[in-house]
C-alpha cells in the first residue's frame, strides 16, 4: 500500500501543470504590494507552515497543509495590509480578497461535517449489505459494488488527479472526459462491473484491488492539489525574486510593484520543483516515524478492536455518549423488534472475516477510500476548496461509528480523540494567522536580520521537536505485551490467566512507584528541599495517569 501511495504521489506531482493560484493572488491583491512586502509575507507563511506542521506531527495529530497555508497567507497579508491602510488610506477589501478568503474557509470546514455524515450513512448501508462475514455475500453484490467503486475512482482520477496532465488536456479522450462526464461514468461502471465479476469468478480479492486503486488516486490527487498548493508559497517567492532581479532596473525593493503575481505563473522549470517535492514526500512516507505516528492516531480512533486508547475521557464525551444512548432508546421504541433483531444480526461480529491484528476489515477500508475520493471529486467539480486531510479523517470517523467500532467502553475515549483532533484544526487556523501576522510584522520591521532570525527559529523548533519525539518514541517502545495478548485471545481461560498476571504486574509496579514517591516526599520535607517535593509530585501525577490506563486495560480484559 505504501508503494502504491508513493507512486501516486510521484505521478501526481509530475503531471500537475503548475502551482495553484491561491498562493499568488488568491488571498492578497499583489498589485498593492511591493517586492519587499511579498517576501515578508511568503517567508512568514513558509515559516509558520513548517513550525505548525512539525509540532502537529510530533504530537501525532493530523492537520491540514491547506488550512495552515490559507490562514498563514491571510495573517501575513493582513500584517502588511495594515501598513498600507495607515500610510496610504487604502481599505482592507482593496488589499485582501475577502470574498475568496471566506469562500475557502467556509468550504474547508463545511467539508468536515459533510464527510462525517456521508461516511456514517454509506458505511451503515454497506455493512447491512455485506455484514462482517462478507465473503458469504459476494456472489451477487460484488459486481455492483466493485463496478461502482472502480468507476468512481477512475472518474476521480480523470477529473481530479489527471485533470491538469497534458496527456488528458491535449487529447481526444481528455475532451470527451470534459464534455461527457455522465457518459464516461456510465460506460466505466458497466465495463468495471463486468471485469469485477470475471475477476471474482477467478477468485481475485476485489476489495484489495479497490483499496489499491483508491490509495493511488487519493495519493495522486493530494500531490496534484494540496502538495502543489503548499509549495506554491515558496515558488511564488522565488518567481517574485526572479522578476525583481530581471526587471527592477534600479527600483528599490520597497517601491517595485508585484502586479506580476496576478498573472499566470511563468516560473521556468516549475515541473522540476514539483517532481522534487514529490520525491521528498515519497521518501518521507517510507522513512518518517512522525508520519507513521500520525497515521497510527487515525487508525487507533477508527479501530474495530478494543485496545489501549490514546486519549482519555472527558465531560463533553461522556455527555455526548449519554445523550446519544438516550436518543437511541427513544427511537428504538418505534422500530419493530423483528427489524432491530435483523439489523443487529447484520452487524454480528462473531464470525467476522477480519485478519488478526488489523484495525478493520477490507469492506470499511474500501468505503473510506472510495468515499474520500468521491467527495474530493465533487468539491473539485464545483470549484469548492477542500482539505484532503479533513475529508479522509472524517470519513474514517463516520464509517467507524456506523460500523459500531465505538462501543460503550471505548466511545468516550474516541469521541474525546475526535474532538481533540477537530479542535486542533481550529487551533491550526488561529495559530497560523497569529504566527504569520507576527513573523510578517517582524520581517517588515527588522529586515534581513529579522528574516535570518526566523530561519534560525525554524531550525531550532525542528531540532527541539525531534529530540522530544525521540524521547516519546523510547517511552512508546515499552509495549504492554500482556494486554495485546488479552485483546487478541479468544480463549476465556487464557484471557483470565493473562489478566491475573497483568494485575499482579500492575500492583508490583504501583507499590514500587509509591515507595519511591514517598521517599522523595519525606526527603524533601526533612531536608527542606523543594525540588525533591516537586519531583515527587510530578511522578505522582504520571503514576496516576498510568494507573488509569492500567485500570482501563484490565476492565477491557474482564470482558
Which functions belong to the PLM regions below?
Residues 1-493:
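Multi-pass alpha-helical transmembrane bundle typical of ion/small-solute transporters
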Residues 468-559:
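Cytosolic, long alpha-helical scaffolding segments
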